[in-house]
Curated annotation (Swiss-Prot):
InterPro entries: CDP-OH_P_trans, CDP-OH_PTrfase_TM_dom, CDP_ALCOHOL_P_TRANSF_CS, CHOPT
UniProt keyword annotation of Glycoprotein present: no
Metabolic or biological pathway: Phospholipid metabolism; phosphatidylethanolamine biosynthesis; phosphatidylethanolamine from CDP-diacylglycerol: step 1/2
GO-annotated cellular components: membrane
Topological category with respect to the lipid bilayer: Peripheral membrane protein
Record keywords, A-Z: Lipid biosynthesis, Lipid metabolism, Membrane, Phospholipid biosynthesis, Phospholipid metabolism, Transferase
Principal location listed in the UniProt entry: membrane
The protein's name: CDP-diacylglycerol--serine O-phosphatidyltransferase
EC number per UniProt: 2.7.8.8
Length: 384
C-alpha cells in the first residue's frame, strides 16, 4: 500500500471526532472507564489494550465453535466463558481510547486498528449470541448475523460521509454489548431453555399473529421478522440521516458503496443456503470468510476517510467471493464445493493478514510512531 504525499499529509492531520450519546455510556460506563483507567499504567499502549480485547473475542469464537459447533446447545461453562471474555473485550474497547487521551498517544493508526478489531468482533458476537439463543445455523442465525453486521457497517459509513462517529441514545457499542453479556450470563444462570422459550412462536404469538395477517402465511419465525423489521427500519433511518448531511454528488458515492455491500451480503446468503447440506466445518469456513471480507471492506471505508482516497483493499477477496458464490450454484460442481470453499478461505485469510500487516506498517512509518508501545516521539507527534 503506497501513499502519496497528500495522503500522508491527510493521515497526519486527521483527528477522530466521536460523540457517545448512549445512556449507559454517559451515566455508567464513563465512571467505570475512569475507575479502570486509574489502574492502567501509563506505559501500556492503547493498541495493546485493543489487541487484548481481540484475543479475548478470538478465544470466545474458538470455544463456541469447538463446544457448540451447531450453535444450538451451549454447555453452561461456554455461556459463562463467553460472558467473561466479552467483558474483557468490552472493558478493553472502552479503555483504549481513554488510555490514548490519558497518555497523549492517540493516532489515526489507533483509530483504524480499533475499528478493524471491532469489525471482527461484530461477527464473533453474533456467532456467540446465536449459540446462547439456540438459533443454530438456521435462517434465524442468518438474519441475526446480517442485522448485527449491517448496523455496524452503517456506523462506519456515517463516519466516512459525515466526518463524525456518533453513537445514539441506544447504541450497539454500549447497550448492545451489555445486552449480549447479560444474555450469556442469564443462560449460564437459568439454562439454555430460557431464550428458546422467550424467542419461541408460542411466547411471541401476538407478533406471529400480526405478521401472519400481513404476509398471508405463517411459514416464518416470529423472532426472525422482529429482527428483520428492526434491520430495515434502522437501515432506512440511518441512510436518511446521512443523506440530510450530504450534497447530491456524495449521495451517488454513498449508494454505490451500499450497492457493493448488498451484493456481497446477497452472495453470502446464497452461499450459506447452498452449503446447508455440507459439513459443519465448511459452513463455518464460509461464515468466517464472510467476516474477513466484511472486515476488510469496513477497514477500507475507514482508511479512505482518513487518507481521503479509496484504496479498494477489499476488491480481490470481494470479487473472489462473488465468483465462488455464483460458480457453486452449478450442479456439476457440487462435489467440489468443500474444496473450493476451503481454498477460498485460505486465500482470503492470507490476503486479510497481509493487508492488515501492510496497513499497520504503512501507517506506522508514515506517522513515525510505534504500534504496541508508547515512546516520547509518539506523544509529541500525536499532539502535533
Amino acid at each position: 500500500m503506497k501513499m502519496e504525499p497528500d495522503e500522508v499529509s491527510s493521515l497526519r492531520k486527521h483527528r477522530f471526532v466521536g460523540t457517545d450519546n448512549s445512556i449507559l455510556g454517559r451515566y455508567v460506563l464513563h465512571h467505570y472507564t475512569n475507575w479502570m483507567l486509574e489502574k492502567i499504567p501509563a506505559f501500556v499502549a492503547p493498541n495493546m489494550l485493543t489487541l487484548c480485547g481481540l484475543i479475548a473475542m478470538v478465544a470466545s469464537l474458538a470455544l463456541t465453535l469447538a463446544f457448540d459447533p451447531c450453535l444450538c446447545s451451549p454447555p453452561a461453562f461456554l455461556s459463562l466463558a463467553n460472558f467473561l471474555l466479552m467483558f474483557v473485550y468490552f472493558t478493553c474497547d472502552n479503555l483504549d481510547g481513554a488510555q490514548a487521551r490519558k497518555t497523549g498517544s492517540g493516532s489515526s493508526l489507533g483509530q483504524l486498528f480499533d475499528h478493524g478489531v471491532d469489525s471482527c468482533c461484530a461477527l464473533i458476537t453474533s456467532i456467540a449470541l446465536s449459540s446462547t439463543f439456540g438459533f443454530g445455523l438456521s435462517p434465524k442465525f442468518l438474519i441475526f448475523t446480517l442485522a448485527v453486521m449491517v448496523q455496524f457497517y452503517l456506523a462506519g459509513i456515517e463516519e466516512k460521509f459525515t466526518g463524525r462517529f456518533v453513537l445514539g441514545r441506544i447504541s450497539g457499542a454500549s447497550e448492545g454489548v451489555v445486552f449480549a453479556m447479560g444474555a450469556h450470563l442469564a443462560t449460564f444462570l437459568c439454562g439454555k431453555r430460557l431464550f428458546r422459550h422467550l424467542f419461541s412462536d408460542n411466547f411471541l404469538w401476538p407478533v406471529k399473529k400480526i405478521y401472519s395477517s400481513i404476509l398471508g402465511t405463517d411459514n416464518f419465525s416470529a423472532v426472525s421478522v422482529i429482527i428483520g423489521t428492526a434491520l430495515v427500519f434502522n437501515t432506512a433511518s440511518t441512510l436518511i440521516s446521512i443523506e440530510f448531511k450530504m450534497h447530491f454528488p456524495r449521495r451517488l458515492l454513498l449508494y454505490s458503496t451500499i450497492l457493493r455491500v448488498m451484493s456481497f451480503v446477497t452472495s453470502f446468503v446464497i452461499l450459506h443456503n447452498t452449503l446447508s447440506t455440507e459439513s459443519l466445518w465448511i459452513r463455518h469456513l464460509n461464515i468466517l470468510m464472510f467476516g474477513q471480507i466484511f472486515s476488510i471492506k469496513y477497514v477500507n471505508e475507514v482508511c479512505s476517510y482518513i487518507i481521503r482516497r479509496d484504496p479498494f483493499l477489499f476488491t480481490p477477496p470481494y470479487l473472489m467471493y462473488l465468483t465462488v458464490s455464483a460458480v457453486l450454484q452449478l450442479q456439476y460442481l457440487k462435489e467440489f464445493r468443500e474444496t473450493l470453499v476451503a481454498i477460498s478461505f485460505l486465500l482470503s485469510s492470507m490476503y486479510y493478514l497481509l493487508v492488515a500487516l501492510r496497513i499497520i506498517i504503512t501507517f506506522k512509518e508514515a506517522l513515525g510512531i510505534s504500534f504496541l508501545s508508547i515512546t516520547t516521539s509518539d506523544k509529541s507527534k500525536a499532539g502535533g
